[in-house]
Amino acid sequence: TVSVVAGSTVSSSVGSPAAFPADCNGETTAVYDVGNNKTVIFWMGASNAGKCVVATVASNNTVSVGSVVEFEDGSVDSDIAATYHAAAGKIVVVFRDNGNSGYAKARVGTVSGTSISFGTVVTFYNGDSSRKANVVYSSAAEKVVVVYSNDSTSDGFSKVGTVSGTDISFGSQATFESGAVGGNEIGMAYDSNADRVILSYRDQNNSGYGTAIVGTISGTSISFGTKAVFKSATTSGLSSVYDSVAQKVLLSYLSTGTEAIVGTVSGTSITFGASATVKSSGTGTASTVYD
């Protein structure tokens, strides 16, 4: 189960804010590069170009940012996802290219100092992908897993990606849901203890219920177990994170309010405890992070 603690005041010193590019047209996505001790921030900029910047946190808690780099000069969607590939020491970013029929694409980024450079753009889905593309890293397989859906059919798909140098290639496509992926988000978390990928989404064929499914990586392929309902009501704003100490997955979502629930993975299945209400009302997107 999960419980909600009372809010607390941040006791550590807070540094001064850093100037950030003003052309952000949507949400930002940040990913931490462990090897370089840097944070890369992605966003949709002017003319809907995909942009990013490398941020450095100093010992006195001040933040500095490098020069803006475009990873896609066409037209991206505001929902950009990224993860850190620990074995390769690279950043993998996935996005929807609205300037190319909504295809789902990926690039490998290399951080050097206060800048980042990218390898060749790779299309991993040449169909009308929705805004649900997401990505996680599997430390056991040393692969990334991407998920996405078709904007017209609402089919949900997944692929395993292999990073080599500054390039990425993908294995065969697996379907985790047929004609039922609703909303604008697919939550993803990697359970390092079970070596499993957990997806959470809104099942349009089942009254919009919050649903989760467990994926197993084998080589360059992924397969899925039986889906499980974690909320018998319409959900949205899905997000998830893995707690390495408790060895559990925490899902957050919006229903009548903002809620959270803990999942336990066993084999190719997942079970859930009782949910907790974080906020009784409100709309938007829930977000989770492990401290």
Language model regions located:
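Extracellular, repeat-based ectodomains that mediate carbohydrate processing or recognition
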Residues: 1-291
